């Protein structure tokens, strides 16, 4: 959906380019800002309940986004997706952290990151023919179907790790966040890395529109953006083992 979100907001919903970019930017920022807090909540209720909630929110959000492409529905749907996605990030990283040892943790996270990029690669691979043959709305229904399947699989096969009641309170999490942003060296590093992410996210914010407007509607920004996840999923485990 990332690869099509600004296209969908402007071409289907009716936002202009600037508003669509702002909405997409806030959506992406929320996905990365919320995990410390949704992760604390996931610790409290248990990872299994939290991931079921997450996939439920994602299924609802994607379906509403595709079924009712009007501004009054799309914006709340994106908020639902933002919270659902932020749960996934924190739960999966938490599961890896709690089910690996110091010796296996690096390998565990590399496998997790590799699988994330397998999903990113396959998602954009299917998004291209869906966009051409059935339109941008179909990508949302495809995403809703995939998250619904994930919800069913999680319900039957995901075993909870021992997380209930172990998490920190939201107050403690917020205090930790304040300590982080007052660490000058870390903040400088974050700003440096942020420069990279600003450029990288243009693959989703502006590149699709640029390619389609300059090359034509038959062009494939999806495959251009696929270079990144392809390189990651084929090299991350190997590099980690070096």
Residue ranges and their predicted role:
Residues 25-40, 227-239:
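Central cavity-lining transmembrane alpha-helices of secondary-active solute carriers
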Residues 87-101, 211:
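Intracellular juxtamembrane helix-capping segments at the cytosolic ends
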Residues 2-6, 184-222:
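Extracytoplasmic gate region of multi-pass secondary transporters
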Residues 137-156:
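Symmetry-related core transmembrane helices of the 12-TM Major Facilitator Superfamily/SLC fold
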Residues 164-190:
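Juxtamembrane intracellular "pre-TM" segments in multi-pass secondary transporters
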Residues 56-70:
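C-terminal ends and interior cores of transmembrane alpha-helices
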Residues 106-132, 146-147:
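Glycine-rich segments within core transmembrane alpha-helices of 12-TM secondary carriers
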């Amino acid at each position: 959906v990332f690869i099509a979100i600004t296209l969908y907001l402007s071409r289907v919903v009716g936002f202009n380019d600037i508003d669509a970019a702002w909405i997409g930017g806030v959506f992406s920022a929320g996905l990365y800002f919320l995990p410390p807090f949704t992760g604390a909540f996931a610790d409290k209720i248990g990872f299994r309940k939290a991931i079921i909630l997450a996939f439920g929110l994602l299924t609802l959000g994607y379906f509403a986004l595709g079924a009712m492409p009007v501004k009054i529905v799309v914006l709340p749907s994106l908020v639902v997706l933002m919270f659902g996605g932020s749960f996934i990030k924190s739960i999966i990283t938490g599961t890896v952290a709690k089910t690996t040892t110091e010796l296996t943790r690096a390998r565990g996270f590399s496998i997790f990151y590799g699988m994330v990029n397998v999903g990113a690669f396959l998602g954009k691979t299917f998004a291209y023919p869906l966009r051409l043959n059935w339109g941008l709305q179909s990508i949302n229904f495809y995403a809703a179907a995939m998250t619904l399947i994930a919800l069913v699989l999680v319900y039957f096969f995901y075993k909870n790790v021992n997380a209930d009641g172990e998490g920190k309170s939201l107050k403690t999490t917020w205090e930790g966040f304040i300590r982080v942003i007052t660490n000058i060296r870390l903040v400088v590093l974050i700003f440096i890395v942020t420069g990279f992410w600003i450029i990288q996210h243009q693959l989703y914010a502006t590149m699709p529109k640029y390619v389609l407007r300059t090359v034509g509607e038959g062009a494939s920004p999806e495959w251009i953006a696929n270079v990144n996840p392809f390189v990651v999923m084929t090299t991350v485990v190997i590099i980690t083992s070096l």
